[in-house]
Each structure stands twice: as structure tokens, then as C-alpha cells.
């Protein structure tokens, strides 16, 4: 977030632009749940505000996301790659009733994936979107810094 001075007064506001992506594996898993892209974008908004459930190392964060009609406690867990900048990548998701957590081997693989995704240059990122490796779900700037979900079709 970059502070912006507004109208020569003491009022400050922030303008944030960030993009949210799903890996192909995560998008496939998402279709099997009742979770929506809007809920995922709202979860990113919470993480930007500092509401992170766990930092797993290697730029991988864990975030609980509520399924419709259920609270966060019994819903899904998502693993997200970010350097807390303008790019956020959903890597992996699971329902709490399916498994307790990822294994150390899975976490290491996810950390390596996170590193490679976060190191993508802009043209490489656009190529990954074009070939379906990544799907973008949020890419907007709003005065509050909140992402507006992109329509999926």
C-alpha cells in the first residue's frame, strides 16, 4: 500500500492494487466445493489487513475461509503464496474434516511452487494466464484497497 496525501489536508487514504490468482490445481479443487471466488477475494482482503491464520514459511500463508452457511472453524483451509505485495496465489485448499494439515513434504513442494510463482516476470505471468496455468479472479483498485472480484465465465 502506498499512502496518498489528499487535498492538502491531514486526511490520508491508501490506494492498493493487487491481483489474485488460482493455480490450475486449486481451481479444480474449488469447483468441487461451494466456495466462491468472491469469498477468496474477501479472504485476501483480510490477509492484507493482517488477519493471517499461520505463516508456514517460504512465503506460504494459511487462511481459513468460511463456506456458505458455515463458520470459519469448520470450513476450508487455503494455502496462499505472497510476499505481501500486489500478487497473491492460491496454491492448495482442503476441508478441515478431510485432513488436519499438509505434510512436511507437501509443504516443501508448495514453498518451491510459491517461490517460482512469485518470481514470475509480468510477461511470464500473462503467458501463464493465457495458457490456463493460472486463473485471475481479482484485479482491481478501489479507494479502500479492497479487491473487486473479476467475473468468471
Residue spans for each PLM region:
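Short amphipathic alpha-helical patches
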Residues: 49-54, 63-71, 102, 114-118, ...
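Arg/Lys-rich, positively charged N-terminal/basic patches that mediate binding to nucleic acids
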Residues: 1-35, 127-153
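Enriched for short, Lys/Arg-rich terminal
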Residues: 7, 81-140
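N-terminal first-folded block
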Residues: 19-67
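Surface-exposed loop/turn and secondary-structure junction residues enriched for glycine/proline
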Residues: 4, 23-24, 38, 59, ...
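Amphipathic alpha-helical interface surfaces
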Residues: 22, 36, 40, 72-75, ...
Amino acid at each position: 500500500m502506498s499512502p496518498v496525501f489528499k487535498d492538502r489536508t491531514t486526511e490520508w487514504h491508501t490506494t492498493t492494487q493487487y491481483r489474485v490468482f488460482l493455480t490450475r490445481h486449486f481451481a479444480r479443487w474449488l469447483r468441487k466445493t461451494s466456495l466462491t471466488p468472491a469469498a477468496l477475494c474477501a479472504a485476501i482482503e483480510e490477509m492484507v489487513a493482517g488477519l493471517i491464520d499461520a505463516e508456514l514459511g517460504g512465503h506460504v500463508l494459511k487462511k481459513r475461509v468460511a463456506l456458505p452457511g458455515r463458520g470459519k472453524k469448520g470450513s476450508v483451509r487455503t494455502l496462499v503464496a505472497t510476499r505481501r505485495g500486489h500478487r497473491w496465489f492460491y496454491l492448495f485448499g482442503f476441508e478441515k474434516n478431510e485432513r488436519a494439515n499438509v505434510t512436511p513434504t507437501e509443504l516443501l513442494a508448495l514453498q518451491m511452487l510459491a517461490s517460482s510463482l512469485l518470481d514470475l516476470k509480468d510477461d511470464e505471468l500473462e503467458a501463464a494466464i493465457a495458457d490456463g496455468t493460472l486463473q485471475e479472479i481479482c484485479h482491481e483498485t478501489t479507494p479502500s484497497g479492497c479487491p473487486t472480484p473479476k467475473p468468471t465465465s
